[in-house]
A protein has these predicted regions:
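Short secondary-structure transition/capping segments
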Residues: 3-9, 73-75, 122-123, 178-179
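Adenine nucleotide phosphate-binding catalytic loops in nucleotide-utilizing enzymes
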Residues: 126-127, 163-210
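Active-site regions of enzymes building and remodeling cell-envelope glycoconjugates
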Residues: 5-12, 161-169
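Short beta->alpha connector loops at strand-helix junctions that form conserved
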Residues: 1, 11-13, 63, 169, ...
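Residues that form or immediately flank small-molecule/cofactor binding pockets and catalytic motifs
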Residues: 13, 64, 151, 170-173, ...
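Phosphate-binding loop of NTP-binding sites
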Residues: 16-145, 150, 154-163, 193-196
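Short, polar loop motifs at secondary-structure junctions
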Residues: 1-3, 150-154, 170
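N-terminal leader/targeting and accessory segments in enzymes
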Residues: 1-20, 24
C-alpha cells in the first residue's frame, strides 16, 4: 500500500531509471573520472588506482564490486562539492552494458586490465569480449588517455587515433615493471618509463598484482 503523502514516480524499468538519475547527478560535477574494466583484476586495480589518485585528490570509488547498473549509480551519488576525482569500476556480461554505464559515468580516462574468457558464453569469443570491453571508450572525450595492458594479446592490438593510448606491462609497454622481487607479504619492483625509474613496494604478493 502507498502512504497517503509523498511523491511517487512510476517508471517502466527501475534499474534504467536509477542509472539515468545517477548520470544526471554526475553531470552536475566537473571532475576527472577514471573508468576501468577487464575480465579479471577490476576490483584490485580499482583499489590501487583510488589509493594513488587519493594521495593528492579527495577521491570517491566504487564500493566493493558494485559495478553494474544498480551498483554504479550508488557510487555516483557519493559525489559532492568536495569531491575532486572518482574511480569507477564497470562490469558486464552482455554487449551494451558498459555502453550504458559510461553514458551515465562520463569518464575522462579509461583503463582495461585484460581480456580473458569471463562471460564468453554470452559474447561468443575473446574478440567479442574485447568488443564489449571497448565500449568503455564510447564515453571518452577525444584525446583522453586510454590505458591498456600491453602484455595481453587482445589489448595489444588496439589502435584508435581518437585517444591517447598508453600501454603498460612487464614484457610490453611504455610503462614497464622490472626487477620484481616477491617477499613474505610484499612485492618490490621498479616502474620504468622513458629512462626514468620509480621504485615501488606494494603490500601484497603476486606478479599479477604488479
Amino acid at each position: 500500500d502507498l502512504t497517503p503523502s509523498g511523491a511517487f514516480v512510476k517508471v517502466e524499468n527501475t534499474a534504467k531509471a536509477l542509472l539515468a538519475l545517477g548520470g544526471y547527478y554526475r553531470s552536475k560535477f566537473n571532475i576527472p573520472v577514471v573508468a576501468l574494466t577487464g575480465s579479471v583484476g577490476k576490483t584490485t586495480t580499482k583499489e590501487f588506482t583510488s589509493l594513488v589518485v587519493g594521495a593528492k585528490y579527495k577521491t570517491i570509488k566504487t564500493q566493493g564490486n558494485l559495478n553494474n547498473e544498480i551498483g554504479l549509480p550508488q557510487t555516483l551519488f557519493q559525489i559532492d562539492s568536495s569531491t575532486q576525482a572518482a574511480v569507477i569500476e564497470m562490469g558486464m556480461n552482455h554487449f551494451g552494458e558498459i555502453s550504458r554505464l559510461v553514458s551515465a559515468t562520463k569518464p575522462t580516462l579509461a583503463l582495461i586490465t585484460n581480456i580473458g574468457v569471463s562471460h564468453i558464453e554470452n559474447l561468443g569469443s575473446r574478440d567479442g569480449i574485447l568488443k564489449a570491453k571497448l565500449e568503455i571508450t564510447e564515453g571518452l572525450p577525444n584525446g583522453a588517455p586510454l590505458i591498456l595492458n600491453g602484455d595481453n594479446d587482445k589489448l595489444a592490438t588496439v589502435k584508435n587515433d581518437n585517444f591517447n593510448i598508453c600501454f603498460y606491462g612487464i614484457e610490453n609497454g611504455e610503462f614497464k615493471a622490472e626487477n620484481i622481487v616477491e617477499r613474505d607479504s610484499t612485492t618490490d619492483f621498479d616502474i620504468v618509463y622513458r629512462g626514468n625509474t620509480q621504485h615501488i613496494t606494494i603490500p601484497t604478493i603476486g606478479v599479477h598484482n604488479v
